[in-house]
Amino acid sequence: MPYKTAIDCIEELATQCFLSKLTDDDVSTFRRVCSKENDIIKLALRIPRTIDYTSILRLLYDTLPLRSLSFNEALPLFCYSIDPAQQRQCDLRFYLRDVVKLARPRKRLEMQKALLQWLPSLLSDVTLQLLNDIRIRFEEIQPNIRQTVLQIYDRTCYPSLNFEHPNLGVFPETDSIFEPV
């Protein structure tokens, strides 16, 4: 399927969210299409976290006009805004990525199957509510996964999440990143 815009390409990548790494062809197409997109924040916010998110960030950095910044200086542009709800959204994406990566093989397959029901939503605007719903479902599939993640990664990897709280300190019903309609 031909890619007409950067968003088309990103949406194709989104269908692989958490499921697989990018193929060489995907990377090549992504590089080519994204080189035409100038709005880096808009582009970055439309890319769900993937297993190999850092590689995608590096591709973005290589292809978009950020030459005046080092990769490490540019990285926060992709990850955080001053809005606390968007920070939690970002950290939840990283947490979900790590949950899938660290799940036991059978549980990982179950998580990947469960994720299929959310793919249509992941292709559009991802809300904090949706990400929290996915988190709850994944933690039901492998109840000890939170402890597993924290054994491998320090809680400071997800600075806006509160691991002392059952809901990680995320309340989607009041913590919306979108203005009420």
UniProtKB/Swiss-Prot annotation:
Effect of residue 162 to D: In strain: ATCC 7754
Result when mutating residue 104 to K: In strain: ATCC 7754
Domain of life: Eukaryota
Keywords: Plasmid, Plasmid partition
Induction text: Repressed by the negative regulatory complex REP1-REP2.
Annotated phenotype, changing residue 125 to N: In strain: ATCC 7754
Effect seen on changing residue 171 to L: In strain: ATCC 7754
Effect after changing residue 136 to T: In strain: ATCC 7754
Keyword presence, Transcription: no
GO biological process: plasmid maintenance; plasmid partitioning
Function: Plays a role in 2-micron plasmid partitioning. Antagonizes transcriptional repression of recombinase FLP by REP1-REP2. Regulates both stability and copy number of the plasmid by blocking the formation of the REP1-REP2 repressor complex.
Name of the featured protein: Trans-acting factor D
Annotated gene: RAF1
